[in-house]
């Protein structure tokens, strides 16, 4: 209740009191009325101040370092929208770094802490958050999901406590292989490191089987079961057995990016990736959404929800832009010359 409304109520009450009570009784009770009026105003003001000073807690559930820039974009846009860290919002940042057990524990901790919202940066993180928040009123906003079909019934409305942005990662798989063919036409045998227990595994394999045979590729799965596994598995990918490497948006595989890049350069194999940030870190190419931009896009959704919108009523959004990115230093290291016509189409280059 506003100060003006409180004042109006007290004034009307005092006027009504003067009309219906005897003069003698009024005189004796006037001090009591004044005290009561002041008490009402002070209590209301105290409640208003408490509400104004409430600090929202937003939990961030990340599954790999490579997805972290989505949350950085989110925080930056939230600041622009008026959410100042330490003043009216607090962020509880968690990163499982590819560990599924740790991820489940972190999600449950956020629920137990009764956070106001959980923000995720991958399909794996979102599925885990959805399971942890089942039966609660905690909204989950996913800043990037390569496979939203795992999360919602349709793109029009989620019908649940989930809302967010699709990275369109699966849909762009064929395009990445087409680019690899343009850059390295002789590539036929492709190694694909992947977690067979991952949330996206079946969808990734189905998309690969559908999109790559027509391009003349034979894609072989190289299974990775833990982060520690990466250093053991990566050396098995050699130029004797393969012509190139493709890294899907797999949280566990992505956490070992340095090993895959090191092996690709050592064996002079082109390495295509599903993540823009991985090109900056040494992969040769990608055609993908910008996770920082996705984070900013997701902040607008979060703002709507924090102001009263229901996640179930919000449509799943698509990326505002898709970028072609190349790492020219890596191209030189593996002895690959980038055709001029491809360079002219490139949105971002890293050296």
Segments and roles (model prediction):
Residues 1-351:
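Short hydrophobic alpha-helices and adjacent helix-cap/hinge residues
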């Amino acid at each position: 209740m506003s100060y003006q409304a409180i004042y109006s109520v007290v004034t009307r009450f005092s006027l009504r009191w003067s009309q219906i009570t005897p003069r003698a009784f009024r005189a004796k009770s006037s001090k009591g009325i004044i005290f009561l009026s002041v008490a009402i105003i002070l209590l209301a003001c105290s409640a208003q101040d408490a509400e104004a000073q409430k600090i929202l807690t937003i939990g961030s559930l990340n599954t790999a370092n490579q997805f972290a820039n989505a949350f950085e974009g989110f925080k930056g846009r939230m600041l622009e929208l008026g959410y100042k860290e330490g003043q009216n919002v607090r962020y509880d940042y968690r990163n499982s770094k590819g560990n599924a057990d740790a991820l489940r524990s972190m999600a449950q901790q956020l629920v137990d802490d009764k956070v106001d919202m959980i923000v995720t940066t991958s399909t794996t993180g979102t599925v885990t958050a959805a399971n942890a928040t089942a039966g609660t009123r905690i909204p989950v906003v996913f800043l990037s999901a390569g496979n939203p079909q795992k999360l919602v019934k349709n793109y029009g409305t989620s019908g649940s406590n989930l809302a967010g942005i699709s990275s369109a990662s699966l849909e762009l798989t064929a395009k990445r292989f087409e680019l690899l063919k343009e850059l390295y036409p002789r590539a036929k045998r492709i190694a694909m490191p992947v977690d067979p227990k991952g949330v996206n595994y079946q969808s990734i394999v189905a998309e690969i089987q559908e999109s790559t045979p027509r391009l003349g590729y034979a894609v072989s799965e190289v299974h990775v079961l833990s982060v520690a596994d990466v250093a053991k598995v990566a050396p098995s990918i050699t130029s004797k057995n393969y012509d190139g490497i493709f890294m899907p948006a797999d949280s566990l595989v992505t956490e070992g990016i340095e090993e895959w890049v090191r092996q690709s350069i050592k064996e002079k194999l082109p390495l295509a990736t599903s993540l823009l940030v991985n090109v900056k870190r040494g992969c040769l190419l990608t055609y993908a959404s910008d996770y920082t931009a996705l984070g900013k896009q997701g902040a607008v959704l979060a703002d709507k929800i924090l102001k009263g919108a229901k996640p179930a009523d919000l449509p799943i959004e698509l990326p505002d832009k898709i970028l072609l990115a190349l790492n020219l230093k890596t191209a030189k290291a593996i002895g690959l010359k980038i055709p001029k016509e491809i360079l002219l189409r490139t949105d971002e280059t890293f050296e």
